[in-house]
A protein has these predicted regions:
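Low-complexity, Ser/Thr/Pro-rich intrinsically disordered linker/stalk segments at domain junctions
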Residues: 1-60
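Accessory, often N-terminal, substrate/partner-engagement and coupling regions
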Residues: 47-93
Length: 562
């Protein structure tokens, strides 16, 4: 039964509401809530307050508490600390620093230099106790120095196990893809060979790149394996290494590879890469460039059958076998009216742009004012006709030799346009060794690539769950940065998956925005005497959706008690 007890502090007595129970046969206080001084208790009973607050603060709470709850369920701090023991002079353990970095990546990405100021705006210091000065950016760097490549691999492997046991994650279907991220590392820095100039997918050709291979589950798009590599290396060159590591990891959590199916796109295709997949015995679903298989494309549309009218209205297919990449395997040629229409619209826009450029060049040559020789004009025409399929439909003829005599004529071959559309538009060739699957399941597996693509887009969002900003300039620290950035994506997608299963269908950003709306208000009181102001904390009002999320992620355990 609850009771009120007083505790003497100097000349003053402060009162608490306590509840006792027997623990191991002995009476113990199991809960305690501060009520205040005698005057404050009397004022509360009278429905008044002895003093008004002198000021207030607003702290970030909901999103950070939910993320920390997920990190706690994963056991991140303990896992990291098991491979990177804490130094005696460190303000916090290595695991704590990595958890703090990952949480920051999820809710409000910033540099380590700005971290302490950001942390002060949150309620996190109530449940993560760190000494003053321990959140300095140099302390983060010290912690990162304790995690080499092997330690990161061990941590990632153990986290994979925890995701299966704690969240029931289904690893039978995995999707592999690769991308790269631009960095702002100085060109003269020779301590980060992993950052190289290459084909930037963010179109920043002026910046050095870090490549990232990611394997995510079809069950929620949750990352289970990442691999950072130099940004100047083609994606296809990293495929075998990622598959080998994936097989090693999977065998640590499952006795057999027979249930595992890996999905990847045609960009990873090569005879050597496919030989690796065949040797491992993995199930796979990939794709082949349709234009490489004209005989299959020539199958008449009357031979196509519906894939699944309920799941994929309008989608039809031809289910056959095909020899490619050195093997003969099942091939599912699909035709999608939606893709067909989109490709047709896109190609019409490309054609219109090419026609406009040809007309401009034609008019310029007709005026006889060009100074370019014939070879230069031919190169300009070739550049205009270079986009995919344009050269099949537009025909350009250049006459004359002298620059002032050069003339251009061009025409659109509408019959060629029609043949092109009938042959290619709307078609995909899926390549798989899952012969027992219905065609609809093969299509579903291939389309699950959207999960990893969504993850890459999320990591390029500068506001939440972002890869950047990255202010590191050595290989080792870049790899640690990649690790906790991928971990942030893992946590965010686990949260989205958990919300989805609870009937809350929202994107990562929508989810975090709802949680961020749960704030903590701090009221500061001072009676005019000596000493620091007394703080009273409370959470802001919540909407029904916010309340459901608060319950779902159990953030109440981090809520203030007084």
């Amino acid at each position: 039964m609850p009771s009120i007890v007083g505790k003497r502090r100097g000349k003053h007595t402060y009162y608490y509401l306590v509840e006792s129970a027997r623990v191991d046969g002995k009476p113990r206080i199991v809960s305690q809530e501060y009520l205040g001084s005698a005057e404050e208790v009397m004022a509360k009973l009278a429905g008044a307050s002895t003093v008004e607050p002198v000021r207030s603060q607003h702290k970030r709470f909901g999103d950070l508490a939910a993320v920390w709850s997920m990190l706690d369920r994963l056991g991140l701090v303990a896992i990291v600390d098991s491979v990177a023991p804490r130094r005696a002079d460190a303000g916090a353990s290595v695991g704590t620093y990595i958890a703090l970095a990952a949480a920051n990546r999820v809710v409000a990405p910033c540099s380590k230099l700005a971290f302490a100021d950001w942390w002060a705006t949150t309620a996190g210091s109530r449940w993560v106790k760190t000494p003053a000065g321990s959140l300095d950016h140099r302390r983060f760097w010290d912690a990162m120095d304790h995690l080499d490549t092997e330690a990161l691999r061990q941590v990632e492997t153990e986290l994979g196990r925890r995701m299966v046991t704690e969240f029931g994650l289904d690893l039978s279907g995995l999707v592999l893809d690769m991308t790269n991220f631009a960095t702002y590392i100085d060109s003269t820095n020779d301590r980060a060979p992993i950052a190289q100039r290459g084909k930037a997918k963010q179109k920043r050709m002026d910046l050095r790149l870090v490549g990232l291979a990611l394997v995510v589950t079809r069950d929620g798009g949750v990352p289970v394996l990442s691999h950072a590599y130099p940004g100047d290396r083609p994606d296809v060159s990293q495929f075998a290494m990622v598959i080998d590591e994936l097989v090693t990891r999977y065998r640590q959590v499952s006795e057999s590879l027979e249930s595992l199916t890996v999905v990847y796109d045609a960009g990873q295709n090569s005879h050597d890469n496919h030989a690796v997949v065949e040797e491992t015995g993995l199930g796979f679903v990939g794709s082949l460039p349709p234009s490489d298989h004209p005989d299959l494309l020539a199958v008449p549309r009357t031979d196509y059958l519906p894939v699944d009218a309920d799941r994929y209205p309008g989608l039809t297919c031809v289910d056959t076998t095909l020899t490619a990449l050195g093997v003969t395997r099942r091939a599912v040629l699909t035709h999608s009216p939606t893709l067909h229409a989109a490709q047709s619209r896109g190609f019409d826009q490309t054609l219109a742009k090419a026609r406009r450029r040809l007309a401009e060049l034609q008019a310029r040559l007709a005026r006889g004012k060009t100074r370019r020789d014939r070879a230069a004009v031919e190169a300009a025409i070739a550049a205009i006709l270079k986009p995919r399929w344009v050269g099949e439909v537009l025909t350009a003829t250049l006459t004359g030799e002298d620059p002032t005599e050069l003339r251009l004529t061009w025409r659109t071959d509408h019959n060629a346009r029609k043949r092109l559309e009938d042959r290619l538009f709307g078609k995909r060739i899926l390549f798989t060794n899952r012969t027992e699957w219905p065609a609809a399941d093969v299509v579903a597996a291939y389309r699950s690539q959207s999960e990893v693509e969504a993850g890459f887009r999320q990591q390029k969002d500068p506001h939440v769950v972002s890869f950047g900003p990255m202010h590191h300039w050595t290989d080792q620290k870049i790899r640690v940065h990649v690790f906790y950035s991928v971990l942030a994506l893992t946590v965010a997608h686990l949260m989205r998956r958990q919300a989805e299963r609870a009937g809350l269908h929202m994107s990562v950003r929508e989810l975090l925005t709802e949680l961020a709306g749960i704030g903590e208000t701090v009221l500061l009181y001072h009676d005019g005497g000596k000493g620091r102001p007394r703080a009273r904390r409370m959470l802001t009002d919540t909407t029904p959706t916010q309340q459901r999320l608060a319950d779902l992620f159990n953030i109440h355990r981090y809520a203030p008690t007084r």
